[in-house]
Regions:
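Amphipathic alpha-helical coiled-coil segments and their boundaries
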Residues: 43, 50, 57, 100, ...
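Bacterial Sec-pathway N-terminal export signals of envelope proteins
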Residues: 25, 29-78, 101, 109, ...
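Sec/SRP-type N-terminal targeting helices
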Residues: 55-59, 72, 102-129, 154, ...
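Bacterial Sec-dependent N-terminal signal peptides
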Residues: 1-41, 408
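A small-residue-enriched
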Residues: 45-103, 240-307, 311, 317-318, ...
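Periplasmic alpha-helical coiled-coil/stalk elements that build and connect Gram-negative outer-membrane
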Residues: 7-10, 131-245, 334-337, 341, ...
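Short segments within alpha-helical structural elements
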Residues: 128-129, 136, 190-215, 353-408
Length: 408
């Protein structure tokens, strides 16, 4: 933001301008006084209830779990009927009924594999839920920041309008040049565009939250954040706790169990397959009937099946190790970022609380030590510093949201 105004001689107008600037600055102060309520919990709970995306994930998980339990029963029974008429009369009639079944060990292991796959499906649903709620929380954090910016820019826009109107009046009375009026008008246009840009971003964030909420409109006018929690003192121990509680890692661990149970199923598929049934053959003069038994020995069909299953286990374990490494590195980066941002915020707030530059600038201006142009430029620097503080507050909340996403 840039304020570019030349000196103004109209004392009444100067007082109104300075008064407007003081109101603008005082409005910024509350932006960083946080509430102690659960700031986004209500919105996140509502999104969890209304989200069509989560509903789709839920239905998909149910279908997947049903599919995992499909095919665990024995094969269908087989019935054969034959009628063979003779060349010289008479006919032979055949009948056969048989039931094939796998070795009992295979059914047991298939059932355990299906149970493990169903647990994995539930954990995947929890992981997807965490990702969706984290996205919603990020939108809320960005929305608070843009709400605060909109409040700040609205005040500054009022000031820009007052300055532009004052210059227009002075120009009509011959006390200002057209160039000075154009500068004031350009400053007003810049502030209008900044406010429109922020309001557009706010509408986009609200639209995104509404979509995440299943089409139900979301309203949030907060302009401040909750106080932040203290970072853990023992980072390494905390990373282990975070990993243990993170549903994404629970899903990866379960995928390893699924792969291991797949090895057991593959081994059991190398066991013989049996069939039992009834067979009958009848002619006009004679009839034969009795029980028939069969066995199928899988000599070639399951070749490399166990080897493939073991490779799946190795791949799942490697994926887990890679995810653990990336997660730890990401958390360490976010942890250090939070520490640095917290220090930056403390330094900003300490300077603002102790120095009260707005009052010092005002006294210097009213005492004749600063021209209005110098006063406005100094005040602009003060506003820009507050914007940086707001951005730092936002960045800290975004980093913390990702750090503690596993708690959602």
């Amino acid at each position: 933001m840039r304020i570019r105004i030349n000196n103004i001689k109209d004392n009444a107008m100067i007082r109104r301008t300075v008064s407007c600037l003081a109101m603008c600055l005082s409005a910024v102060m509350p932006l960083f006084a946080g509430n102690t309520d659960g700031q986004f919990r209500k919105i996140l709970d509502e999104i969890e209830r209304n989200s069509t995306t989560l509903a789709v994930y839920g239905k998909s998980t149910e279908a997947q779990k049903i599919g995992n339990r499909t095919g665990l029963a024995p094969e269908n029974p087989e019935i054969e009927l034959g009628y063979l008429p003779g060349i010289h009369g008479g006919a032979r009639k055949d009948i056969g009924i048989s039931q094939s079944f796998d070795f009992p060990t295979l059914y047991s292991r298939k059932g355990k594999l299906a149970d493990a796959q169903n647990v994995s499906a539930d954990l995947q649903l929890r992981s997807r839920r965490m990702d969706l709620l984290l996205e919603a929380e990020r939108c809320c954090i960005e929305l608070v920041f843009n709400n605060a910016l909109a409040a700040l820019y609205s005040r500054q826009l009022d000031n820009a309008k007052a300055v532009a109107d004052a210059y227009e009046r002075k120009f009509r009375h011959g006390d200002a040049t057209r160039i000075e009026c154009n500068k004031a008008a350009l400053n007003l246009t810049n502030m209008e565009n900044e406010l429109k840009k922020v309001n557009l971003e706010r509408r986009q964030l609200l639209s995104r939250l509404t979509m995440l909420n299943g089409g139900v409109p979301v309203e949030m006018a907060d302009t401040s954040y909750n106080p932040v929690r203290q970072l853990p003192s023992d980072f390494r121990a905390w990373v282990l706790e975070a990993e243990a509680a993170n549903p994404a890692f629970a899903y990866l661990r379960q995928e390893i169990e699924v792969a291991k149970k797949g090895v057991g199923v593959s081994k059991a598929m190398g066991l013989p397959k049996f069939s039992v049934g009834y067979a009958g053959e009848f002619t006009p003069d004679e009839g034969w009937q009795g029980v028939k038994l069969g066995v199928s020995i899988p000599l070639w069909e399951n070749r490399n099946r166990v080897k493939h299953a073991r490779a799946e286990v190795a791949a799942a374990e490697q994926a887990m190790d890679d995810a653990r490494l990336q997660y730890s590195a990401r958390l360490e980066f976010l942890f250090e970022q939070c520490r640095e941002l917290t220090g930056n915020i403390s330094r900003y707030e300490s300077v603002f609380e102790k120095n009260s530059n707005d009052e010092l600038l005002y006294r210097a201006f009213t005492g004749g030590e600063l021209s209005l142009l110098d006063y406005l430029l100094e005040l602009e620097y003060y506003f820009n510093s507050y914007e940086k503080l707001m951005q730092t507050q936002r960045d800290l909340r975004l980093a913390l949201a990702e750090l503690y996403a596993y708690e959602l």
